[in-house]
Amino acid sequence: PTRRSSDLEKTDADGYDAKEFDLTLGYSTGGFSVSITDYWYNTGAGYFHYGAHNTTHLYEAQVGYDFGPVAVNWYTNFAGDDGVKENGDRAYSSYISIAAPFKLGGLDWTAEVGATPWETDFYGASGFAVCDVSLGATKDIRITNSFSLPLFAKATWNPCSERAYFVVGLSF
């Protein structure tokens, strides 16, 4: 599970929905996991612009533990195009999620609830706010005996922003 970047209202200079490119480096052992993700949007400075005040990259750290029936993850934006507090200070926008996986109809499902613990305009929250209630499914689509594509789909409702999203993709 990762942060719901689809919850962000991003448009390019012409007002079209922004394109997003995410790179994640992670490690897990047993139930413990840790990762760093670079989220990039085509909403301003080009891909190779990493300046403190002219980047559209966002860097996020994750730490979590999968207890079996429930997984708990904490995410914090630590650099890049993060949100701010009302006073203008960097918010170090953070997010905690609790996810419960289950199997149904030949698919792997996950029900998830997530919240931001403090004020940040990144998530549009003035304090603690539930910003993710979601249901997702994954299925490996077999192409050959030795190769399959891991397809996922997820429906998300954000009570804080009163918006809903549907995401489909592939995981590698």
What are these regions (language model features)?
Residues P1-S5:
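Short, small-residue-biased leader/transition segments that mark boundaries at the very start
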Residues N77, L135, I141, S161-F172:
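Outer-membrane beta-barrel "beta-signal"
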